[in-house]
Amino acid sequence: MATGTPAAELRELSEDELVTRLRESKEELFNLRFQMATGQMDNNRRLRTVRHEIARIYTVLRERELGLAVGPDAGDAA
Protein backbone atom coordinates (compact mmCIF):
# COMPACT_ATOMS: atom_id res chain seq x y z
CA MET A 1 0.00 0.00 0.00
CA ALA A 2 1.34 3.41 -0.94
CA THR A 3 1.31 5.70 2.05
CA GLY A 4 2.34 9.29 2.41
CA THR A 5 4.38 10.96 5.09
CA PRO A 6 2.53 11.33 8.41
CA ALA A 7 1.80 14.89 9.52
CA ALA A 8 3.70 14.34 12.77
CA GLU A 9 6.84 13.57 10.79
CA LEU A 10 6.34 16.66 8.62
CA ARG A 11 6.00 18.85 11.72
CA GLU A 12 9.53 17.85 12.75
CA LEU A 13 11.02 19.28 9.54
CA SER A 14 12.28 22.82 9.12
CA GLU A 15 10.51 25.23 6.80
CA ASP A 16 13.22 24.88 4.14
CA GLU A 17 12.88 21.09 4.21
CA LEU A 18 9.10 21.39 3.91
CA VAL A 19 9.41 23.69 0.89
CA THR A 20 11.85 21.23 -0.69
CA ARG A 21 9.47 18.33 -0.06
CA LEU A 22 6.60 20.37 -1.49
CA ARG A 23 8.55 21.08 -4.68
CA GLU A 24 9.51 17.40 -5.04
CA SER A 25 5.93 16.27 -4.47
CA LYS A 26 4.60 18.72 -7.04
CA GLU A 27 7.14 17.48 -9.58
CA GLU A 28 6.13 13.89 -8.86
CA LEU A 29 2.45 14.79 -9.25
CA PHE A 30 3.20 16.41 -12.61
CA ASN A 31 5.04 13.28 -13.77
CA LEU A 32 2.25 11.01 -12.55
CA ARG A 33 -0.37 13.06 -14.38
CA PHE A 34 1.75 12.88 -17.52
CA GLN A 35 2.00 9.08 -17.15
CA MET A 36 -1.77 8.89 -16.66
CA ALA A 37 -2.40 10.91 -19.82
CA THR A 38 -0.09 8.73 -21.90
CA GLY A 39 -1.43 5.46 -20.49
CA GLN A 40 1.82 4.43 -18.80
CA MET A 41 0.51 4.60 -15.22
CA ASP A 42 0.94 1.44 -13.15
CA ASN A 43 -0.29 2.58 -9.75
CA ASN A 44 -3.32 4.90 -9.86
CA ARG A 45 -3.40 5.10 -6.06
CA ARG A 46 -0.09 6.99 -6.05
CA LEU A 47 -1.82 10.07 -7.52
CA ARG A 48 -4.12 10.32 -4.52
CA THR A 49 -1.28 9.69 -2.08
CA VAL A 50 0.88 12.46 -3.54
CA ARG A 51 -2.04 14.92 -3.57
CA HIS A 52 -2.71 14.16 0.10
CA GLU A 53 0.95 14.59 0.95
CA ILE A 54 0.97 18.01 -0.73
CA ALA A 55 -2.10 18.97 1.30
CA ARG A 56 -0.40 17.83 4.52
CA ILE A 57 2.67 19.96 3.75
CA TYR A 58 0.50 23.01 3.04
CA THR A 59 -1.36 22.38 6.31
CA VAL A 60 1.83 22.25 8.37
CA LEU A 61 3.15 25.42 6.71
CA ARG A 62 -0.16 27.20 7.37
CA GLU A 63 -0.19 26.08 11.03
CA ARG A 64 3.22 27.67 11.49
CA GLU A 65 2.13 30.83 9.68
CA LEU A 66 -0.84 31.22 12.02
CA GLY A 67 1.22 30.37 15.08
CA LEU A 68 -0.80 27.24 15.86
CA ALA A 69 2.33 25.12 15.74
CA VAL A 70 5.99 25.96 16.05
CA GLY A 71 8.77 24.53 13.96
CA PRO A 72 11.67 22.53 15.36
CA ASP A 73 13.99 25.56 15.23
CA ALA A 74 11.70 27.79 17.34
CA GLY A 75 12.21 25.77 20.53
CA ASP A 76 15.95 26.45 20.56
CA ALA A 77 15.50 30.24 20.51
CA ALA A 78 13.71 30.36 23.88
Curated annotation (Swiss-Prot):
Pfam families found in the cross-reference section: Ribosomal_L29 (PF00831)
A single GO cellular-component term on record: cytosolic large ribosomal subunit
Keywords, in A-Z order: Ribonucleoprotein, Ribosomal protein
PROSITE patterns: RIBOSOMAL_L29
Sample GO molecular function, one term: structural constituent of ribosome
Record flagged with keyword Lipid metabolism: no
GO biological process: translation
Family membership noted in the UniProt record: Belongs to the universal ribosomal protein uL29 family.
PANTHER family, sorted: 60S RIBOSOMAL PROTEIN L35/50S RIBOSOMAL PROTEIN L29 (PTHR10916), LARGE RIBOSOMAL SUBUNIT PROTEIN UL29C (PTHR10916:SF0)
Protein name: Large ribosomal subunit protein uL29
Biological source species: Rhodococcus erythropolis (strain PR4 / NBRC 100887)
